[in-house]
Amino acid sequence: MKLSQMTYAVSSCLLFLSGLSSAVFAENCMQLIDKQDFKSAEEICSQSCDDGDGYSCYALGKILAEFGETSQDYQEAATYLTKACNLNSADGCSELGSFYVDGLGVQQDEQQAKTLFDKACELSSADGCHKLGNVYLIVLQNFDKAKSLYEKACSLKYGESCSNLGYMYFNGFGIEKNISRANELYQKACDLNSSRGCYNLGFSYYYEEPRNFEQAKINFEKACTADSADGCLNLGYIYINGHGVAQNYEQARNYITKACELNSGKACADLGSIYSESVGVKQDLQQAINYYQKGCELDSSDGCMYTAVLYLQGQGVKQDYNQAKKFFEKSCDLKNGLSCSNLGFLYFEGLGVEQDLKFASELFLKACNLNSGDGCSNLGNSFLNGSGVKQDYTQAGIYYDKACSLDYGQACGNLGYMYWKGLGTPKDLGKAKMNYEKSCDTLNNGFGCYLLGGFYLLQTDNSASADLAQKYFDKACKLGHQEGCEELEKINVQE
């Protein structure tokens, strides 16, 4: 869509307008933009841009970018923005910088974008200073420079910069962590209608001690009203957990649904879990998978993983290992360690793929490096049994130890067993017992309880040990460990 191709209702006024001064054209251009009468503005702004008014050139570029449909429209928009910037329009430079970041109508060039943001900021564009601050914070990780730029933009009443500056204080990025100062800046951002500022303030009240659920709710509501998906999602959490309000699953679901509709992948995945786990609604696995898949489409690693699990188990859908593999792969690519481990399980068992123990172990390693206890434990199993890797008890112990430190109960049990038997490590009954106890008493793992029961069963010197053995076999049985049930039955028969 070219400017020359556009016809608007202002044509009857052209003779009158042609007699106006360039200053009047520019003023009329701004007034029409303020009224959001973009069709009329385009004709007027074109004249004032030709007369050398930078703002009008910027406005033309914005209109074309907003309503353009082809790459040619973006190229034409970039041309107007370039002219605007050359005429020292701060907004024109800032917007053109964004074009270079995204490669809209121009060759993508982050260095050129930085140069343009720098010029915009020097021309006192709060937007330019903010975007330049983002470059220094995220790309260059120069916290001092980012802080200085956010401070300038915040002083120019740019709410997003106040929020980002607060975020730096909240997390201690390049400055001493200061929650009180962060909250002041979040409040200023929120007052400047930054939904991110309202959300961040709510987040601080919700999660930081001393927690203030009432203030968290107030600020999440402000953020949600301004269409912040994160604000709506966390407001849903408040109602699910009954924090400062009466627990209300329906209200929670409404807010989480809104967050999903605002394209929060996490919210869509959470909504899937609400239907899968019957949280305030009747279980509906078809709805669950619909929301999980939408979450996955929005790059929620959990959404992809739970979709894969339903295909793996054939719940709500026909069992399909190929589909499970596809969704585990995407989730793993999104750095979900548990999905990498589950994908490794498919290759380990040959489910929907040709069995490949070596590749399975590689996936377990990737999962473990992403701090998946399941992945570390599976890799420990591979080294213990020599599956896809050379058998190595020492390596097995290392990975069981890491998995146990990640609170994976099965691995704590296996680590204890290695100390019990002296596999890859000196025999140490004290460490064996300690790991069994963590597995059973702390992490409620049936296998660990079974091993702990066995530990006490072999201590035949007193009746107290026999009672403890019975206690832990009983717990193992209640946790679904069949061998624990069998040992418990033997003890009961003997009695």
Task: Please tell me what each predicted stretch does.
Residues 27-40, 44-47, 51, 66, ...:
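Alpha-helical segment of the N-proximal tetratricopeptide repeat
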Residues 475-495:
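Terminal, low-structured helical/coil segments at or just beyond the last alpha-helical repeat
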